[in-house]
Amino acid sequence: MQKMRILLIALCLGTLCGQVSYGGAGDRILLLGDSMMASNRGSGQSVAAVIEAAVGQDVSDRSVAGARYFYNLPITGKLGLRLTEQYQKGQWNWVVLNGGGNDLLFGCGCSKCAKMLDRLVSKDGLRGAIPSFIANIRKTGAKVIYVGYLRNPGVQSPIKACKPAGDELDRRLTRMARGDAGITFLPMSDLVPSGDRTFHQSDLIHPSVKGSRGIGARIAHVIKK
Protein backbone atom coordinates (compact mmCIF):
# COMPACT_ATOMS: atom_id res chain seq x y z
CA MET A 1 0.00 0.00 0.00
CA GLN A 2 2.81 2.42 0.88
CA LYS A 3 4.56 1.67 -2.42
CA MET A 4 1.31 2.37 -4.26
CA ARG A 5 0.96 5.74 -2.52
CA ILE A 6 4.52 6.67 -3.46
CA LEU A 7 3.86 5.62 -7.06
CA LEU A 8 0.72 7.75 -7.26
CA ILE A 9 2.52 10.77 -5.85
CA ALA A 10 5.40 10.32 -8.29
CA LEU A 11 2.97 9.95 -11.19
CA CYS A 12 1.13 13.11 -10.21
CA LEU A 13 4.29 15.14 -9.73
CA GLY A 14 5.84 13.86 -12.92
CA THR A 15 2.93 13.93 -15.34
CA LEU A 16 -0.44 15.02 -14.05
CA CYS A 17 0.49 17.87 -11.79
CA GLY A 18 3.33 19.32 -13.80
CA GLN A 19 5.59 21.93 -12.27
CA VAL A 20 3.95 23.51 -9.25
CA SER A 21 5.40 26.91 -8.36
CA TYR A 22 5.16 27.99 -4.74
CA GLY A 23 4.94 31.71 -4.20
CA GLY A 24 7.71 33.63 -2.53
CA ALA A 25 7.35 36.46 -0.06
CA GLY A 26 6.99 39.04 -2.83
CA ASP A 27 4.30 37.23 -4.81
CA ARG A 28 0.90 38.88 -4.89
CA ILE A 29 -0.83 36.97 -7.71
CA LEU A 30 -1.97 33.37 -7.27
CA LEU A 31 -3.07 31.32 -10.28
CA LEU A 32 -5.19 28.17 -9.98
CA GLY A 33 -6.96 25.97 -12.48
CA ASP A 34 -6.74 23.11 -14.93
CA SER A 35 -4.89 22.44 -18.18
CA MET A 36 -6.06 25.70 -19.74
CA MET A 37 -3.78 27.43 -17.26
CA ALA A 38 -1.10 24.73 -17.00
CA SER A 39 -0.50 24.25 -20.74
CA ASN A 40 2.87 25.36 -22.14
CA ARG A 41 4.41 25.68 -18.67
CA GLY A 42 7.26 23.36 -19.60
CA SER A 43 8.43 25.80 -22.28
CA GLY A 44 7.99 28.83 -20.04
CA GLN A 45 5.08 30.13 -22.14
CA SER A 46 2.10 29.42 -19.91
CA VAL A 47 -0.65 31.84 -18.97
CA ALA A 48 1.22 32.61 -15.73
CA ALA A 49 4.38 33.52 -17.67
CA VAL A 50 2.40 35.87 -19.90
CA ILE A 51 0.85 37.61 -16.88
CA GLU A 52 4.25 37.96 -15.18
CA ALA A 53 5.78 39.59 -18.24
CA ALA A 54 2.85 41.95 -18.75
CA VAL A 55 2.36 43.21 -15.19
CA GLY A 56 5.90 42.91 -13.84
CA GLN A 57 4.90 40.81 -10.84
CA ASP A 58 5.65 37.20 -9.96
CA VAL A 59 2.77 34.78 -10.34
CA SER A 60 2.51 31.72 -8.10
CA ASP A 61 1.19 29.12 -10.54
CA ARG A 62 -0.43 26.12 -8.82
CA SER A 63 -2.65 25.02 -11.70
CA VAL A 64 -2.83 21.28 -12.42
CA ALA A 65 -3.84 19.63 -15.68
CA GLY A 66 -7.01 17.59 -15.21
CA ALA A 67 -8.13 19.39 -12.05
CA ARG A 68 -11.81 19.25 -11.09
CA TYR A 69 -14.00 20.54 -8.30
CA PHE A 70 -15.41 17.07 -7.68
CA TYR A 71 -12.48 14.66 -7.38
CA ASN A 72 -12.53 11.88 -4.80
CA LEU A 73 -9.06 10.27 -4.80
CA PRO A 74 -7.38 11.55 -1.63
CA ILE A 75 -3.66 11.59 -2.48
CA THR A 76 -3.73 13.07 -5.97
CA GLY A 77 -6.61 15.26 -4.87
CA LYS A 78 -4.41 16.81 -2.20
CA LEU A 79 -1.73 17.34 -4.83
CA GLY A 80 -4.05 19.56 -6.82
CA LEU A 81 -6.34 17.41 -8.93
CA ARG A 82 -9.06 18.59 -6.55
CA LEU A 83 -9.06 22.20 -7.60
CA THR A 84 -9.78 23.70 -4.20
CA GLU A 85 -6.66 22.00 -2.81
CA GLN A 86 -4.50 24.18 -5.06
CA TYR A 87 -5.18 27.25 -2.94
CA GLN A 88 -2.25 28.37 -0.81
CA LYS A 89 -2.57 30.90 1.99
CA GLY A 90 -0.80 34.16 1.36
CA GLN A 91 -1.16 37.93 1.15
CA TRP A 92 -2.60 37.78 -2.34
CA ASN A 93 -3.84 40.87 -4.14
CA TRP A 94 -5.29 38.76 -6.93
CA VAL A 95 -6.38 35.15 -7.26
CA VAL A 96 -6.85 34.15 -10.90
CA LEU A 97 -8.50 30.83 -11.68
CA ASN A 98 -10.60 28.76 -14.02
CA GLY A 99 -12.31 25.43 -13.57
CA GLY A 100 -15.42 23.34 -14.05
CA GLY A 101 -14.70 22.14 -17.56
CA ASN A 102 -13.34 18.76 -16.51
CA ASP A 103 -16.35 18.24 -14.25
CA LEU A 104 -18.61 18.79 -17.25
CA LEU A 105 -16.48 16.67 -19.59
CA PHE A 106 -15.86 13.71 -17.27
CA GLY A 107 -18.80 14.11 -14.89
CA CYS A 108 -21.61 14.22 -17.44
CA GLY A 109 -19.93 13.90 -20.83
CA CYS A 110 -20.96 17.47 -21.70
CA SER A 111 -24.54 16.23 -22.18
CA LYS A 112 -27.44 16.12 -19.73
CA CYS A 113 -25.35 18.29 -17.42
CA ALA A 114 -28.12 20.13 -15.55
CA LYS A 115 -27.30 18.48 -12.22
CA MET A 116 -23.55 18.95 -12.61
CA LEU A 117 -24.02 22.59 -13.54
CA ASP A 118 -26.14 23.08 -10.42
CA ARG A 119 -23.44 21.45 -8.31
CA LEU A 120 -20.86 23.81 -9.77
CA VAL A 121 -22.92 27.01 -9.68
CA SER A 122 -26.65 27.58 -9.38
CA LYS A 123 -28.61 29.45 -12.04
CA ASP A 124 -28.63 32.60 -9.91
CA GLY A 125 -24.87 32.34 -9.33
CA LEU A 126 -25.21 32.25 -5.54
CA ARG A 127 -24.73 28.60 -4.61
CA GLY A 128 -22.51 25.69 -5.58
CA ALA A 129 -18.89 24.62 -5.38
CA ILE A 130 -17.56 27.58 -7.35
CA PRO A 131 -19.36 30.41 -5.47
CA SER A 132 -18.46 28.75 -2.16
CA PHE A 133 -14.77 28.55 -3.07
CA ILE A 134 -14.73 32.12 -4.37
CA ALA A 135 -16.47 33.41 -1.23
CA ASN A 136 -13.76 31.87 0.94
CA ILE A 137 -11.05 33.47 -1.19
CA ARG A 138 -12.77 36.85 -1.03
CA LYS A 139 -12.80 36.67 2.78
CA THR A 140 -9.00 37.02 2.63
CA GLY A 141 -9.33 40.37 0.87
CA ALA A 142 -8.01 39.16 -2.48
CA LYS A 143 -9.73 40.19 -5.70
CA VAL A 144 -10.76 37.31 -7.94
CA ILE A 145 -10.63 36.91 -11.70
CA TYR A 146 -12.59 33.85 -12.80
CA VAL A 147 -11.61 32.95 -16.35
CA GLY A 148 -13.95 31.28 -18.83
CA TYR A 149 -12.96 28.62 -21.35
CA LEU A 150 -11.75 28.89 -24.91
CA ARG A 151 -14.29 27.72 -27.45
CA ASN A 152 -13.87 25.24 -30.26
CA PRO A 153 -12.99 27.04 -33.52
CA GLY A 154 -15.97 25.44 -35.24
CA VAL A 155 -14.33 22.20 -36.36
CA GLN A 156 -14.77 18.65 -35.15
CA SER A 157 -12.97 17.95 -31.88
CA PRO A 158 -13.43 15.88 -28.69
CA ILE A 159 -14.95 18.88 -26.88
CA LYS A 160 -17.14 20.40 -29.61
CA ALA A 161 -20.23 19.02 -27.88
CA CYS A 162 -19.31 20.91 -24.70
CA LYS A 163 -20.32 24.31 -26.10
CA PRO A 164 -23.92 24.41 -24.74
CA ALA A 165 -22.81 23.42 -21.23
CA GLY A 166 -19.88 25.83 -21.45
CA ASP A 167 -22.16 28.67 -22.51
CA GLU A 168 -24.49 28.00 -19.60
CA LEU A 169 -21.56 27.86 -17.18
CA ASP A 170 -20.45 31.28 -18.47
CA ARG A 171 -23.93 32.72 -17.92
CA ARG A 172 -24.03 31.48 -14.35
CA LEU A 173 -20.52 32.74 -13.59
CA THR A 174 -21.50 36.14 -14.98
CA ARG A 175 -24.37 36.27 -12.48
CA MET A 176 -22.03 35.20 -9.68
CA ALA A 177 -19.65 38.06 -10.42
CA ARG A 178 -22.42 40.67 -10.48
CA GLY A 179 -22.96 40.26 -6.76
CA ASP A 180 -19.44 41.35 -5.74
CA ALA A 181 -17.33 44.17 -7.17
CA GLY A 182 -14.24 42.22 -6.11
CA ILE A 183 -15.02 39.41 -8.57
CA THR A 184 -14.44 39.68 -12.31
CA PHE A 185 -15.71 37.02 -14.67
CA LEU A 186 -13.50 37.12 -17.75
CA PRO A 187 -14.96 35.14 -20.66
CA MET A 188 -12.77 33.65 -23.37
CA SER A 189 -15.65 32.53 -25.58
CA ASP A 190 -14.85 35.17 -28.22
CA LEU A 191 -11.06 34.79 -28.26
CA VAL A 192 -10.89 32.12 -30.98
CA PRO A 193 -12.06 33.23 -34.46
CA SER A 194 -14.23 30.76 -36.35
CA GLY A 195 -12.10 28.28 -38.26
CA ASP A 196 -8.84 29.39 -36.62
CA ARG A 197 -7.00 26.37 -35.24
CA THR A 198 -3.92 28.31 -34.13
CA PHE A 199 -5.21 29.08 -30.64
CA HIS A 200 -5.27 25.35 -29.82
CA GLN A 201 -2.76 22.54 -29.80
CA SER A 202 -3.19 19.75 -32.34
CA ASP A 203 -5.70 18.01 -30.05
CA LEU A 204 -8.02 21.05 -30.39
CA ILE A 205 -8.57 20.92 -26.63
CA HIS A 206 -5.63 22.60 -24.95
CA PRO A 207 -4.39 26.11 -25.73
CA SER A 208 -1.37 26.53 -27.96
CA VAL A 209 1.33 29.04 -27.08
CA LYS A 210 -0.71 31.59 -29.03
CA GLY A 211 -3.77 30.64 -27.03
CA SER A 212 -1.94 31.00 -23.72
CA ARG A 213 -0.70 34.41 -24.83
CA GLY A 214 -4.22 35.53 -25.64
CA ILE A 215 -5.61 34.30 -22.33
CA GLY A 216 -2.77 35.81 -20.32
CA ALA A 217 -3.02 39.16 -22.10
CA ARG A 218 -6.69 39.50 -21.22
CA ILE A 219 -6.05 38.65 -17.59
CA ALA A 220 -3.15 41.10 -17.40
CA HIS A 221 -5.36 43.85 -18.81
CA VAL A 222 -7.81 43.41 -15.92
CA ILE A 223 -5.02 43.42 -13.33
CA LYS A 224 -3.43 46.58 -14.77
CA LYS A 225 -6.68 48.57 -14.90
Residue ranges with predicted function:
Residues 80-224:
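Alpha-helical cap/lid subdomain in secreted, periplasmic
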Residues 8-16:
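Bacterial N-terminal signal peptides
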